[in-house]
Amino acid sequence: PALGTTQRFAEEAGAALAAPYAEVRTAVRASARLWVDETSWALRGALRWLWAAATPTATLYRLGRRRNRRACELLIGRAYAGVLTTDRWRAYDGHPLDRRQVCWAHLLR
Protein backbone atom coordinates (compact mmCIF):
# COMPACT_ATOMS: atom_id res chain seq x y z
CA PRO A 1 0.00 0.00 0.00
CA ALA A 2 0.97 3.61 -0.49
CA LEU A 3 2.56 5.52 2.38
CA GLY A 4 -0.61 7.56 2.90
CA THR A 5 -2.67 4.37 3.09
CA THR A 6 -0.32 2.84 5.65
CA GLN A 7 -0.46 6.02 7.72
CA ARG A 8 -4.26 6.01 7.59
CA PHE A 9 -4.35 2.35 8.70
CA ALA A 10 -2.06 3.17 11.63
CA GLU A 11 -4.22 6.13 12.65
CA GLU A 12 -7.43 4.08 12.42
CA ALA A 13 -5.90 1.24 14.44
CA GLY A 14 -4.67 3.70 17.07
CA ALA A 15 -8.11 5.26 17.35
CA ALA A 16 -9.81 1.87 17.58
CA LEU A 17 -7.42 0.69 20.31
CA ALA A 18 -7.42 3.87 22.42
CA ALA A 19 -10.31 2.82 24.67
CA PRO A 20 -9.16 -0.80 25.20
CA TYR A 21 -5.62 0.44 25.92
CA ALA A 22 -6.98 2.88 28.52
CA GLU A 23 -8.97 0.04 30.14
CA VAL A 24 -5.88 -2.17 30.37
CA ARG A 25 -3.81 0.73 31.73
CA THR A 26 -6.42 1.40 34.43
CA ALA A 27 -6.59 -2.27 35.41
CA VAL A 28 -2.81 -2.68 35.51
CA ARG A 29 -2.30 0.46 37.58
CA ALA A 30 -4.99 -0.69 40.05
CA SER A 31 -3.45 -4.14 40.50
CA ALA A 32 -2.10 -5.09 43.93
CA ARG A 33 1.00 -6.60 42.31
CA LEU A 34 2.91 -5.80 39.11
CA TRP A 35 5.81 -7.43 37.31
CA VAL A 36 7.67 -4.76 35.34
CA ASP A 37 10.56 -5.03 32.91
CA GLU A 38 12.04 -3.22 29.95
CA THR A 39 14.08 -4.29 26.96
CA SER A 40 15.88 -2.50 24.15
CA TRP A 41 14.12 -2.13 20.81
CA ALA A 42 15.67 -0.92 17.56
CA LEU A 43 13.30 1.32 15.64
CA ARG A 44 14.59 2.51 12.27
CA GLY A 45 18.13 2.45 13.61
CA ALA A 46 17.28 4.34 16.81
CA LEU A 47 17.40 2.80 20.27
CA ARG A 48 14.05 2.67 22.05
CA TRP A 49 12.81 0.87 25.15
CA LEU A 50 9.84 -1.47 25.28
CA TRP A 51 8.37 -1.45 28.77
CA ALA A 52 5.93 -4.06 30.07
CA ALA A 53 3.85 -4.12 33.25
CA ALA A 54 2.11 -7.45 33.81
CA THR A 55 -0.57 -8.79 36.13
CA PRO A 56 -2.00 -12.31 36.10
CA THR A 57 -4.73 -11.12 33.70
CA ALA A 58 -3.35 -8.18 31.71
CA THR A 59 -0.12 -6.76 30.31
CA LEU A 60 0.45 -3.12 29.46
CA TYR A 61 3.16 -2.17 26.96
CA ARG A 62 4.75 1.18 26.25
CA LEU A 63 7.47 2.02 23.74
CA GLY A 64 9.58 5.03 24.66
CA ARG A 65 12.90 6.79 24.22
CA ARG A 66 14.07 6.50 27.81
CA ARG A 67 15.02 3.82 30.30
CA ASN A 68 14.66 5.78 33.53
CA ARG A 69 12.36 6.33 36.48
CA ARG A 70 10.17 8.79 34.57
CA ALA A 71 9.66 6.21 31.81
CA CYS A 72 8.57 3.70 34.45
CA GLU A 73 6.16 6.26 35.92
CA LEU A 74 4.64 6.84 32.49
CA LEU A 75 3.86 3.13 32.40
CA ILE A 76 2.58 2.43 35.92
CA GLY A 77 1.78 5.93 37.17
CA ARG A 78 3.60 8.08 39.72
CA ALA A 79 1.63 6.85 42.71
CA TYR A 80 1.51 3.09 42.13
CA ALA A 81 0.59 1.69 45.56
CA GLY A 82 1.06 -2.05 45.02
CA VAL A 83 3.99 -4.44 45.18
CA LEU A 84 6.40 -4.10 42.28
CA THR A 85 8.49 -7.08 41.14
CA THR A 86 11.47 -6.00 39.03
CA ASP A 87 15.10 -6.57 38.27
CA ARG A 88 17.64 -4.33 40.00
CA TRP A 89 17.73 -1.57 37.39
CA ARG A 90 17.93 1.86 39.07
CA ALA A 91 14.75 3.11 37.40
CA TYR A 92 12.82 1.13 40.02
CA ASP A 93 14.73 2.47 43.04
CA GLY A 94 12.12 5.16 43.69
CA HIS A 95 9.48 2.59 44.60
CA PRO A 96 9.23 2.07 48.40
CA LEU A 97 11.36 -0.87 49.54
CA ASP A 98 8.53 -2.34 51.62
CA ARG A 99 6.55 -2.74 48.37
CA ARG A 100 9.32 -3.93 46.07
CA GLN A 101 10.31 -7.50 45.30
CA VAL A 102 13.42 -8.23 43.26
CA CYS A 103 12.83 -10.95 40.67
CA TRP A 104 14.20 -14.30 41.91
CA ALA A 105 15.76 -15.09 38.53
CA HIS A 106 17.78 -11.88 38.72
CA LEU A 107 18.85 -12.63 42.30
CA LEU A 108 20.18 -16.02 41.22
CA ARG A 109 22.40 -14.53 38.49
Please provide the spans of the model-predicted regions.
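Catalytic center-proximal scaffold of phosphoryl-transfer enzymes
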Residues: P1-R109
